[in-house]
Amino acid sequence: MNYFSKLSCSWRITLGYLLFMLILPILALLSRASQELFSNFWSIAMEPAAIYAYSITLSMALIASIVNGIFGIFIAWILVRYNFPGKRIVDAAIDLPFALPTSVAGLTLATVYSEKGWIGHFLQSLSIKVVFTKLGVGVAMIFVSFPFVVRTLQPVLQDIEKELEEAAWSLGASSWTTFWKVIFPSLIPSLLTGIALAFSRAVGEYGSVVIIASNIPFKDLTAPVLIFQKLEQYDYTGATVIGTVILSISLFILVGINIIQSLNQMYSK
């Protein structure tokens, strides 16, 4: 009797689902890319347009995840610690990027931030252009990845005992000192998780970016859009190679963050 036959039905279903929905697609991508490894993999992966697309994608995703990390802390704090009219509506609106099709999100952002839009008209007077620029790419990534940080921080903030803050206050600590010395250290693992999830979501964003950006090489073309352009040109090899590079970078960053989290939890005990 082999090991697989000893597994319970629930384990078999779980492993089967992960195999067909996650593992096999990744292996298929890597297998197809490996066919080009000894011929022109690196020449395709290191094309100037591809390198610039990587830099735009990763830099904008990093900025978006950091921005969401900063504002996510404050928003999660307000939603957990304060009661105010319309709180449930605000809390439900946090999940809007999850439910909204990315193409609709891109159209909405392009409308609002266009030169004649509500926000874009004001920014235009400050000589700031969002639509069809790298800034627009960043705005789209911030929008679609925003909920991850808030939703990962909320349960942690709810579990923090109010008595810890009161004890710090009784010892003369200010509210700001209490937050940084007492509350923030316990938020670090969840914050890193939320930022990592936001980063991963932003790196793979296509639907909203393709609408709000001009998608011109060496300007604001991102890697996911470049992959789709390759597919439109029937360049399946190029699309596979670029996709493999982005996948590898994302996995490397996620593994690194998980290692940092593990070390942080180990030393905090």
Swiss-Prot record:
<keyword id="KW-0934">Plastid</keyword>
<keyword id="KW-0150">Chloroplast</keyword>
<keyword id="KW-0472">Membrane</keyword>
<feature type="domain" description="ABC transmembrane type-1">
    <location>
        <begin position="54"/>
        <end position="255"/>
    </location>
</feature>
<comment type="function">
    <text>Part of the ABC transporter complex cysAWTP (TC 3.A.1.6.1) involved in sulfate/thiosulfate import. Probably responsible for the translocation of the substrate across the membrane.</text>
</comment>
<keyword id="KW-1133">Transmembrane helix</keyword>
<feature type="transmembrane region" description="Helical">
    <location>
        <begin position="240"/>
        <end position="260"/>
    </location>
</feature>
<feature type="transmembrane region" description="Helical">
    <location>
        <begin position="60"/>
        <end position="80"/>
    </location>
</feature>
<protein>
    <recommendedName>
        <fullName>Probable sulfate transport system permease protein cysT</fullName>
    </recommendedName>
</protein>
<dbReference type="InterPro" id="IPR000515">
    <property type="entry name" value="MetI-like"/>
</dbReference>
<feature type="transmembrane region" description="Helical">
    <location>
        <begin position="208"/>
        <end position="228"/>
    </location>
</feature>
<comment type="similarity">
    <text>Belongs to the binding-protein-dependent transport system permease family. CysTW subfamily.</text>
</comment>
<dbReference type="InterPro" id="IPR035906">
    <property type="entry name" value="MetI-like_sf"/>
</dbReference>
<dbReference type="Pfam" id="PF00528">
    <property type="entry name" value="BPD_transp_1"/>
</dbReference>
<feature type="transmembrane region" description="Helical">
    <location>
        <begin position="92"/>
        <end position="112"/>
    </location>
</feature>
<feature type="transmembrane region" description="Helical">
    <location>
        <begin position="130"/>
        <end position="150"/>
    </location>
</feature>
<dbReference type="InterPro" id="IPR005667">
    <property type="entry name" value="Sulph_transpt2"/>
</dbReference>
<dbReference type="GO" id="GO:0005886">
    <property type="term" value="C:plasma membrane"/>
</dbReference>
<keyword id="KW-0764">Sulfate transport</keyword>
<dbReference type="GO" id="GO:0015419">
    <property type="term" value="F:ABC-type sulfate transporter activity"/>
</dbReference>
<keyword id="KW-0812">Transmembrane</keyword>
<keyword id="KW-0813">Transport</keyword>
<feature type="transmembrane region" description="Helical">
    <location>
        <begin position="10"/>
        <end position="30"/>
    </location>
</feature>
<dbReference type="InterPro" id="IPR011865">
    <property type="entry name" value="CysT_permease"/>
</dbReference>
<dbReference type="GO" id="GO:0031969">
    <property type="term" value="C:chloroplast membrane"/>
</dbReference>
<feature type="transmembrane region" description="Helical">
    <location>
        <begin position="179"/>
        <end position="199"/>
    </location>
</feature>
